[in-house]
Structures are given as structure tokens and as C-alpha cells.
Amino acid sequence: ADASPNIEPADTFLERHGLAGLSATDVIETLEAMPVAERPANLLASVRPDEVVLTDDENNQASMPLPDDQFYVSIAPYASQTHDCFFHSLTTCRGELANESVQITITAADGTELAAGTYTTNDNGFVGLWLPRDIAGTITITAGERTVSAPIATGVDDPTCITTLQLT
């Protein structure tokens, strides 16, 4: 069985991995935007609804709380190939459509537009969005002539990684 991780302060962990001084939101945004080839192979960063959990290849672990009012969701629309995922891994998750332009609209159940615009997927094939916590609504993604719509939610039991949106 795996040994229990060595839990350490986030500052100590971040400094050792070249992320010194970054907030939890900065860690997420930095790793998400990093070209795949430059991502640290010895670092796992798992985005949970309320924290980001960092683990390295020496079994050190740190966690950083996320803002109380925000929920990070990373979305990888796809045409033909995807993977199952629930908590987004900033260093290992890969989506099919890397560096592609997509239109995304997210509308809350009450009709409020939470996000709308043209986004470019990161090198890992994902678009990461900060949304209000505890909402439910609909996400629509369009890429070229293909579109997909699906429910989306940002509660404590909801996924931070959405890989089920097939463009048709």
C-alpha cells in the first residue's frame, strides 16, 4: 500500500516546485495555461470544488483553499475522443482539441449569462473558467459548424473536469 503523504505547508511545496508566492487561483491558471511539454512531470495538481491538492513524486502533499464564491471548472469539448474525469488534473488531463477557438455560453437556470465569448483551448485541450459557486445552468459550446449543450453545476458535489461534451 502507498505510504501516507507527507503533508506540508503550501508555501514550502510551491517554492520547491517553482511556484513560490502564487495564490491557489494563480497556481491553477499558471499550470492550466502551461504548454504540455513544459508541464512538470513530478507534480500532480488536482482541482477539487473547494481546494487544489498538490502532490509530488516524493509523496509530499499540500492543499490550498479556493475562493468561497468561485468554482473552477475545466472543460474539454471533443469531436471523437475523450476520457473519464471528475476532478481536473492540471498536469495530466488532456483533451482532444488543443489550441482551438471555441464559443462558450453558460447561462444560469434563472437566465443570467455567466460566461459568453470566444475562448482558445489551452495546449492541454481544456478551457478553464471561474464561475460563481452553487449555480446550475446550461453550457453551450460551438466549434465551427458543431455544437453541444448540456447541464452544468458548481456545487460541492459537482465535477471540476468536464470531458463529456461531444461536438456534433
What are these regions (language model features)?
Residues 1-12:
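Short, low-complexity, disordered segments immediately C-terminal to signal peptides
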Residues 10-69:
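N-terminal secretory signal peptides
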Residues 64-66, 71-78, 156-168:
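Extracellular beta-sheet/turn segments enriched in Thr/Pro/Gly and aliphatic residues
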Residues 82-103:
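Short, ordered, surface-exposed loop/turn motifs in non-cytosolic proteins
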Residues 112-124:
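Short, acidic Ser/Thr/Gly-rich low-complexity loop/linker segments typical of extracellular
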Residues 121-129, 139:
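Glycine-centered loop-to-beta-strand initiation motif
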Residues 135-144:
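A short, solvent-exposed beta-strand micro-motif common in secreted/extracellular proteins
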Residues 145-150:
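Short acidic/polar inter-strand loop motif in beta-rich domains
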